[in-house]
């Protein structure tokens, strides 16, 4: 069987909402990381890339009409290289990587650029067409995150809880109190701060030049979302999503901007272009859960993947669990039998600290996991995340050494 390798990857810094990257279009963000991936690997014949697969959750604005194809062209890849955009909401970037790996394993591709992009700052407002002549009942929807243009049958059957409301549901059903959530959030911030100070993200980040003022520019070089905090500060934050709730802005992921590009290659391509793989892509799995508790999606997805691979979770050296909310992260860890402060889970912080640019996050998890696996000299790394409307997705990496 053909083996699929994650050879390399690069990402932008993650910007805050309306922050450092807000002035950059999503197609330009994605083009930027593709361009850097090409520059870092001059031995590759980029005209022989079989596909560009990028995840993107919104696609209602400047990321419309197949942002993967746009980014491939803008990023300097030859016109004959095709591109396709994948949408599994928050899991889009990880799904793009899994799809690229499957193409290689199936013998349908030797080189694939995978990844994801999201500019939540630039997500547009949308308005449906009127359903009758001279109608004055038009509604406008913010596409930054969550539901819009809801199907009444969907609402009646499964509800349309907002993402924070689903986290409140998980907290209530799995007994995750406010203290546990705030403690988890603080660890994320502390680990991210240490990782930044130690330069652990330097290899995966490419700086972005952004406009500033009328004619000026500045260089964005580090993730913008981490912030200094304390349990006292976190405990003082309001719970705006539910009366008597536990979910706050401090124990939730951010609304962010960013892009990631990864290079996936077959064994033959690795040899042909003298590449050194980061990891082997061992497999991936997705699973569905009730939409109202979408945050527990990583549990069945991970169990499904582990069962398929015939390995136990105790054989995994690094786990990157997307921290959409502390409530669901803690619930997932408990359900999987892991300590809430497990040292090998998000050792460099997670989305609560670093941010969550939806369609890019899964690819970011995989890249960070692969680099941490290499740093530790471990054998396996797992990337897993919950997905809006009730899904989870997990992907396993194995050492290429």
Predicted segments — roles?
Residues 111-169:
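Flexible glycine-/small-residue-enriched beta->alpha junction loops
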Residues 168, 204-206, 212, 282-353:
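Active-site pocket-lining segment
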Residues 11, 23, 27-32, 43, ...:
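N-terminal extracellular/periplasmic Venus flytrap/periplasmic-binding protein-like
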Residues 1-71, 75, 82, 166-178, ...:
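Conserved active-site "lid/cap" helical segment
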Residues 1-26, 145-146, 150, 231-296, ...:
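Condensing-enzyme catalytic core mediating Claisen C-C bond formation in acyl metabolism
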Residues 64, 83-92, 251-255, 281, ...:
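Active-site nucleophile and cofactor-binding loops and adjacent substrate-binding regions
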Residues 86-118, 171-200, 261-268, 333-334, ...:
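Active-site-proximal alpha-helical scaffold in enzymes
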